[in-house]
Structure formats: structure tokens, C-alpha cells
Amino acid sequence: MKSELALLLKALAFAARKHRDQRRKDAAASPYINHPIALANVLVKEGGVDDTAVLCAALLHDTLEDTATTRKELQRSFGTKIAAIVAEVTDDKRLPKARRKSLQVKHAARISREAKLVKLADKICNIRDVARRPPTGWDKRRQREYFDWAKRVIDRMRGVHPRLERAFDAAYSKRPGG
């Protein structure tokens, strides 16, 4: 237990360091680290998830995609399993955005259970954020498009965690109208 908690705190510190100069796209330019912390909170508080590897991966989920972190660095610091989960939920930023979004939908059914949990928490947090504090410049149409795309991703991996899926559905029910 003590070593699991230490690993979780190590992941939090690592993510905070890697994301230290990043901000969310909302009008308040919230500190980016709030997002990975929110994922871990959703997994624990709403999903009852206590798998340390999943929680660490949630905290680290955007480090490969949005920072200069390498998979090798994650493996050295957190082990192969956590690095693999993070890699499964990482988009290839070299691809055009539309292709990345399409691949997320396509691959959602094939990723590991652990990666599905992280992806589910990510989509819950993101659509809640879009509903409450949309990114600057996003009109209602763009917000609806994001909600609908997130639902297509989640629909491809239904059955992984019913409680979290209900949380996603509740968040999706707040889809902007218009």
C-alpha cells in the first residue's frame, strides 16, 4: 500500500512538472494539471477504481501526447505496464486532427481494459469541461460536435465499467442545444 501511494504521488509530481507551463483552453486558462487530477478523481470517487497502474496512467495520460516525454522515460520511471497504458491512450500528433479523432473511435474497442478506463474518465472530464467552461472560441455547434465525437468513442467500448458509463451518459445529457 505504501509503495503504491508513493508511485501515485510520483506520477502526480511527474505530470505536474511536465505540464507546468501548460494551460487548458478555457477562458480562465486553468492550469493543465487540473485535468489529469480530475481524471484520477473521477476514477476513484465515481468509479471506485483503486488500480494504481490505472490511476498513475490517468495522471500521466497526456504526457506523451502534449509534452516532450518519451515512452522510454515513462518506462524507466513507472514501469512497462503504466507506460503501455499511457501509450494506448496517446494520439499521434504527427497526423492531421481529423485522422487522429477517427482513429480514436476506430481503436476504442481494441485497447486494454485499463486504457478504456482512462479514456472513459478523460471523455467524462472533457465533456463536463466543455459544458461548464468551453474552450475559448468554441460556439455551440463546435461544442455539440465534440460531445457527439466523444460519445462515438465511448460507444465503441461500452461494457467496461457501467458506473462510469452512466457518469458519461449523465454528462452527455448536458450536451449544448441549438
Where are these regions (language model features)?
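Active-site helical microenvironments for divalent-metal-assisted chemistry
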Residues: 1-178
